[in-house]
């Protein structure tokens, strides 16, 4: 059985993430571990890591950044909102304040092959001028802000939006391919 851990960065939506993943694959085992309590030996047991949303900025979540450092070549990783930003920062990228703060705002997300709606709860996004060479953009919003990334050679992905939100219609588009790896 595949095992997935959600690293809880003090976000109230982590149980929504677990629920939406179970909708996509009811056979996957899911555990939630608080970021500050996660140990290497615990995380080593899992096939997949989801870095949850949360308050603050990536460099304020030292535990999460350490987990990325330790497991980025060993595990499949998906970052949501803060987790997405952390992946970017870990690989040398920078963030910028969004021109307009978005909290609970439904927006269109555009990929090369489809369009869907997702919900934003953030005031920061990836600064494209400092996007690391190892990452590529896979989705944008109406304002051309980066909304999704993937690593060019490792199974690492990030989404700025919240696919687990009730107002988002994209949880299957995001979670199904990730847990199929």
Task: Please name every model-derived segment.
Residues 37-46:
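Short amphipathic alpha-helix with an adjacent loop that forms part of the alpha/beta core around
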Residues 1-5:
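Extreme N-terminal starter segment of soluble prokaryotic enzymes
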Residues 81, 122, 162:
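Histidine-centered divalent metal-coordination motifs
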Residues 113-154:
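Catalytic beta-strand/loop cores that center a nucleophilic Ser/Cys/Thr
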Residues 46-115:
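Cysteine-nucleophile active-site neighborhood
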Residues 9-12, 19, 23, 32, ...:
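A generic "structured core" feature
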Residues 28-37:
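A short beta-strand-loop structural module common to alpha/beta enzyme folds
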Residues 166-181:
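Acyltransferase
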């Amino acid at each position: 059985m595949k095992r997935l851990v959600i690293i809880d960065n003090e976000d109230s939506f982590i149980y929504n993430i677990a629920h939406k993943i179970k909708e996509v694959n009811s056979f996957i085992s899911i555990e939630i571990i608080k970021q500050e309590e996660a140990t290497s030996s615990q995380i080593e047991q899992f096939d997949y890591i989801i870095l949850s949303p949360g308050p603050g900025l990536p460099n304020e979540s030292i535990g999460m950044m350490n987990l990325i450092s330790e497991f980025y070549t060993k595990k499949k990783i998906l970052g949501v909102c803060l987790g997405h930003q952390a992946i970017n920062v870990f690989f040398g990228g920078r963030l910028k304040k969004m021109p307009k703060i978005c909290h609970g705002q439904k927006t269109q997300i555009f990929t090369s092959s489809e369009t869907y709606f997702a919900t934003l709860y953030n005031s920061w996004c990836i600064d494209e001028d400092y996007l690391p060479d190892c990452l590529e953009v896979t989705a944008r919003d109406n304002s051309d802000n980066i909304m999704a990334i993937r690593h060019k050679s490792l199974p690492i992905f990030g989404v700025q939006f919240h696919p687990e939100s009730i107002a988002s219609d994209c949880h299957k588009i995001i979670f199904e391919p990730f847990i199929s790896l």
